[in-house]
């Protein structure tokens, strides 16, 4: 890279607004920015290398005589719900194209009539009568994709839904206690992890309105007017005036860029080169264990600390146990970027309805990692100080520093646009080792209803579990923390070419082990 940091792209709102296409006046389009530029890189996006998956496991509460549930019945109702969702959130039907610039062009065209809209909805929902789980279907999707000419494939759609259950056919009535995995496959370009959950929750709530209704008529929607519901261009939605950004913004941006490059060349786990199938493994704590961990964090570290602070610290401690670095000095540090929901920096009234990507980042910096290790130069006695306050304190200090900036979203938009250009020129930025990457997504209950319920209040299906995961193409372990019904879930997303399942799950268990210490 050299000693001089690259110049950040200028944030120009006029370059990223919705406008009519010169090729087809029916099409609205805008230039991607920030994380959209990263996950929208043409080669990666066509290959689905950042695709998102959300998996909800539904269980029938009882056999209803008034509403005999089957996969076909659920498919028909979901199709109608999707029509309403497309009208309210057209992001779910956007497309992408590319030109000679790195950031993609995001496009939207209204359906010409109800029939075209219904055809789109029907093509978005699929039935799988199989003993496979949602995870199995995801692996099948990705396995088939690897057998194709990936560079010339059509990119993934914004959303495709799979209804998966072990029944004989789609008409078969679901018995009491039967499970249905609802797998949502999304192109990351059109959503981030928060808006993907927002959309899924909205979809399930719309399904609640329709599921006990005998009406099969299409909802009356005035197609053509829904384009006004597209999320506002993010630069126009910022609370701050980007024209007023000055030296402080530039200095913080340079600090962030420097940290990104430090991450590419810093401490990490050894990986094997190559690109294979994406994989995900899960570790779920019970609700009792999760509450005990949270209480332990508050008691040991202080009421202002969260389970997210602990989890990020545990990722670093687990890394030290796995790699057992020799000859650490007091100057050795751990640096890693962490994605952050950017909606807090949007204007009031826009944050709760922004479905396009709205993501920035914070830089986690833990000083003197030697101090986290006992018996550093004695292999037999090597072990991290897993009960020490320091890593959690450093994590919180990093969080507070970056999240307190009023311009943090603007900073992330500029830096991530720059990073997309860097990754286009350097598709493999890591050399031999890569630092594990931590993401905290919070409580899924904020977005997803606990059950599928009729308008009369009858619970037809409970949502027993909900988990989010994504495809991983870069050679780092992505550790995600989320929860469902008070039970915390740690997941690891990785690429099979870079790590074996044994290596990935070993690391995940190390993270969970150190977090559980705080429950004791």
From Swiss-Prot:
Residues 1-23 are annotated as: Disordered. Pathway: Sesquiterpene biosynthesis; trichothecene biosynthesis. It comes from the Eukaryota. InterPro entries: CAT-like_dom_sf, Tri3/Sat12/Sat16/Mac1. Induction: Expression is positively regulated by the cluster-specific transcription factor TRI6. One of its GO terms (molecular function) is acetyltransferase activity. Trichothecene O-acetyltransferase; part of the gene cluster that mediates the production of the antimicrobial trichothecene harzianum A (HA) that plays a role in Botrytis cinerea antagonistic activity and plant defense priming. The biosynthesis of harzianum A begins with the cyclization of farnesyl diphosphate to trichodiene and is catalyzed by the trichodiene synthase TRI5. Trichodiene undergoes a series of oxygenations catalyzed by the cytochrome P450 monooxygenase TRI4. PANTHER family: CHROMOSOME 7, WHOLE GENOME SHOTGUN SEQUENCE-RELATED, CONDENSATION DOMAIN-CONTAINING PROTEIN. This is Trichothecene O-acetyltransferase TRI3. It comes from Trichoderma arundinaceum.
């Amino acid at each position: 890279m050299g000693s001089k940091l690259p110049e950040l792209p200028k944030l120009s709102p006029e370059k990223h607004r919705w406008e009519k296409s010169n090729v087809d006046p029916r099409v609205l389009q805008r230039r991607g920015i920030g994380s959209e530029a990263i996950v929208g890189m043409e080669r990666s996006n066509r290959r689905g290398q950042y695709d998102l998956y959300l998996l909800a496991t539904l269980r029938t509460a009882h056999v209803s005589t008034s509403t005999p549930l089957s996969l076909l019945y659920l498919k028909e109702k979901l199709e109608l719900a999707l029509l309403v969702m497309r009208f309210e959130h057209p992001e779910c039907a956007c497309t992408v194209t590319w030109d000679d610039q790195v950031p993609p062009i995001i496009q939207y065209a209204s359906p010409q009539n109800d029939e075209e809209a219904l055809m789109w909805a029907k093509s978005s929902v699929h039935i799988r009568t199989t003993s496979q789980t949602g995870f199995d279907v995801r692996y099948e999707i990705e396995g088939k994709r690897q057998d194709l000419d990936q560079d010339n494939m059509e990119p993934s759609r914004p959303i495709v839904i799979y209804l998966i259950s072990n029944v004989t056919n789609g008409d078969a009535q679901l018995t009491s206690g039967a499970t249905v995995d609802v797998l949502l496959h999304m192109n990351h370009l059109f959503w981030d992890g928060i808006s993907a959950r927002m959309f899924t929750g909205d979809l399930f709530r719309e399904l609640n309105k329709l599921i006990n209704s005998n009406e099969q008529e299409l909802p009356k929607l005035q197609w053509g007017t829904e384009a006004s519901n597209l999320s506002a261009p993010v630069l126009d939605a910022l609370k701050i005036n980007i024209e007023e950004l000055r030296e402080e913004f530039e200095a913080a941006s340079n600090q962030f860029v420097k940290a990104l490059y430090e991450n590419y060349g810093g401490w990490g786990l050894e990986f094997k080169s190559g690109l294979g199938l994406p994989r995900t493994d899960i570790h779920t704590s019970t609700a009792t264990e999760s509450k005990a961990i949270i209480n332990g964090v508050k008691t040991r570290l202080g009421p202002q600390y969260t389970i997210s602070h602990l989890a990020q610290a545990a990722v670093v401690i687990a890394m030290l146990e796995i790699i057992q670095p020799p000859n650490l000095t007091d100057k050795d540090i751990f640096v890693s970027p962490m994605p952050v929901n950017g909606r807090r920096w949007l204007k009031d009234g826009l944050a709760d309805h922004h479905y396009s990507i709205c993501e920035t980042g914070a830089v986690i910096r833990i000083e003197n990692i030697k101090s986290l290790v006992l018996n550093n130069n004695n292999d037999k006695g090597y072990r991290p100080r897993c009960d020490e306050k320091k890593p959690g304190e450093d994590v919180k200090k990093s969080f507070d520093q970056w999240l307190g900036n009023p311009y943090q979203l603007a900073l992330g938009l500029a830096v991530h646009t720059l990073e997309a250009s860097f990754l286009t020129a350097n598709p493999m930025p890591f050399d031999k080792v890569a630092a594990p990457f931590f993401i905290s997504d919070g409580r899924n209950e904020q977005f997803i209803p606990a059950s599928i319920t009729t308008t009369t209040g009858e619970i037809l299906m409970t949502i027993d579990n909900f988990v989010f995961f994504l495809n991983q193409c870069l050679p780092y372990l992505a550790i995600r923390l989320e929860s469902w019904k008070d039970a915390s879930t740690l997941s690891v997303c990785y690429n099979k070419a870079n790590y074996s399942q044994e290596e990935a799950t070993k690391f995940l268990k190390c993270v969970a082990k150190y977090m559980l210490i705080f429950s004791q």
